[in-house]
Amino acid sequence: MVSKILFGKKISWLLTIFVLWVIVFVLQKPFFLLFTGEGLSSLYAVLWHGLPLDLSLAGYMTAVPGLLLLLGSLPFHCVHTPFVKRVVSSSYQCWMVLAAVLVSLSFVANIALYPYWQFPLDATPLFYIASSPKDAIASVSYWQLLLGLVAVIGISFLIYSLFKTIGRRFSTTLCQPVSTLPWLFLLVFVAALFLPIRGGWSTSTMNTGKAYFSNHQRLNHAAVNPLFSFMESVTHQEDFSSMYRLMDEQQAHRLVSTMLSSKSEADSTVSSSFLTVQRPDIYLIVLESFSDTLMSVANVTPGLNHLKKEGVYFSNFYANSFRTDRGLLSILYGYPAPATVSLMKYPKKTAALTSMPQLLKQAGWDLQYYYGGDADFTNMRSFLINQGFLQIVEDVDFPVSQRISKWGVPDHLLFQRVKKDLRQTKTSTPILRVIQTSSSHEPFDVPFYRLNDKVLNAFAYTDSCVTDFLKCLRSSPQWNRSLVILLPDHLGAWPLDIDNFSFARYHIPMIWTGGAVRQPQKVDTFASQQDLAATLLGSLGIAHVALPFSKDMFNPAAPHFAFFMMNDGFGLMDAHHGVTYDFKRQQIVHAFGDKQQQYVQAGKAYTQTIFNDIATR
C-alpha cells in the first residue's frame, strides 16, 4: 500500500511539472499580443494553434526531472546513499534554475526583438553576438538593457519559485526507492514524454510550422513558442553565405547575368496563344515521383499518354531536385531548390520569397491546397500559409477510416474531395487548386490492381485517379475555363537504380490540358520546374519580375536551359550542350556537346548565386 502511494506521488510530481510548464508557455502569448499591439481578440486561436509546440517544449523540460526521478527511484537500496540523494536533489535545483532562465530569456528577447525583425526568436542573435558583441548591442540604450535584465531576472525568479514550491510539496518523493515493477512503470511514463516532444506517431516531427494558421503573420508568430523556435533554428542552422564559394563574385555575376530573365522580359505581359481564357480556373496537379520514362512503359499511364496528345506537352522538362519539399519550392516559388538543404524548413526564408500563388492571389485568384498526408511534414503548413493558402485540406480532414495508407488518404479519395468541393463552389472568381498526390510513393500500397509489379501498379493507380478526375471535370460547366497543369514533384522509384548524376534522373513530364487550352502542341524548350511560375504568369498577362530565377518558356527572348541539383552536384543542359558535375569529386560525371568547361563554370556560378540569394533572405 505504501509503495502504491509513493508511486502515485512520483507520477503526480512529474505530471505537475509538465502541466506547470504548459501553463507558463501559454501565459506568454497574451503578453506577446499586448506588447506587439495586436490585442486579444484572436487569443483563443493563438493559444490553440500554439499548444502543440508548448506541449512539445514542456516534454523537453520535464524530461530531465523525469530522468532524475528514475535515478532517485532505483529499486536498489545500496545506491540510495546521502551523497546520491544530494546529487539528485542538487541536479534538480540546478536544472530548474537553468530552465527558468532559458525560458524567461527567450520570452523577453522575443518581445524585445520582434518589433525590429518581425519574426519569432531564432539563432540570429547568436550570430550577431558571436561575431561582434559590441555591435550587437550598439543600437540598444542602457535603460533598455537594464529593463530587459530586470525582466529576465524577475520572470526567472517567478518561474523558479513556482517550481520550488512544487518541489517542496514533493520533497520526500524524488529520492525514495520503489520496487522493480513500479520503477518499470515509471520508466514507461517518462518514455511517454517522447509523444508530446515529437508530436505524436505521425511521419512528421514537431516544427514551428505546426503553429501557423492565419494569413496575418503576427498571429502565427504569437502562436510560436519562442524557445522552441530558437532551439529549432540552432539545430538547423546553416551558414549559407559560406557555402559553395566557387569563384570571384564579379565573375559569378558576369556568368549568371545571361542566365536570368531581364527585367523587361519579366515585366512582359504578352499572353500566350496557348490559352483561350485570360483568367482560367487553374488545377495544378503535383504527381508523386512520376518520370517521363514511365510514360513509355506499357499500360502504366494510359491516361497521361492520352492527355499528352490532346494538350500541351513539354518534352524537355526537368525536376530541379530529388525530394518533394525541394520540388514544391521550385514549382510554387519559381526557385531553383538547392539539394543540400530544404528551404521549406526555414519559414523566415520562404516568407521572404515571392511565390507564384502569391502573385495569383494578388491578381484575384482564390487559393486552396489539397494533400492527403500530414501538412505539418517538413514545415509544409507555414510554407503554404506564407504563400496565401489559408484553406488546406489534409489527412485530418478525412475520416480515420479513410486514412489507410502510410502517407494518409489514397489518391482517389483525395480527388473525390476535390470534386465534392468543386460542386459546392459558386463563385465567378478564378481559382487555383493545387492537388498533391501521394500514393505512388513507398510502400506503394494502393487499393487498386492492374499490374503485377507493385511499383508500376501504384503509378497506374494514380494515373487512373487523375483520369477519373479529369473525366468528371470535362463534363462540368467549369471545363471550358479550366487549365489543368500536371507535373511531378520529382522522379522516384522508376526507372530502378538510376544514376543520380544522369540527365534522365531528372527528366519529368509536364502537360497542360483543359478547356482553356487552344490546341495540342509539343514544346521542346529545355526548362526546369522553376520555370513553370514565369511561364504560367506570362501566359496570364501577369508580370513575374519578383521571380528572378524563373524563365518564361514561351518567351523567345528569355534564356532557355534546364538546371537541377543532386546531393553536392548540379546539372545544366540545353538542346546542344549539357553537363552533370560532382562537387565532391570536382569532376564532370556526364556530358555532351563541345562546351563542357563553359557549362561547368556557368553551373558553378549559378549555384553560388543561389546560395548568395538564400543567405540574404
Please report, for each region that a protein language model flagged, where it lies by residue.
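Charged, low-complexity, helix-prone segments enriched in Lys/Glu/Asp/Gln
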Residues: L33, S90, L162-R169, H216-L219, ...
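The feature marks either
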Residues: H216, A223-F228, E232-V270, Q278, ...
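Long, well-ordered, tryptophan-enriched scaffold segments
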Residues: L145-G154, Q250-L255, L384
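Alpha-helix initiation and N-capping motif
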Residues: V24, A130-P133, V224-L227, F240, ...
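Solvent-exposed soluble domains appended to multi-pass membrane proteins
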Residues: S257-R617
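Short alpha-helical "patches" and their helix-cap loops
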Residues: F83-V87, S242-Q251, M344-K348, F549-K551
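Transmembrane and membrane-interface helices of multi-pass
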Residues: V2-F240
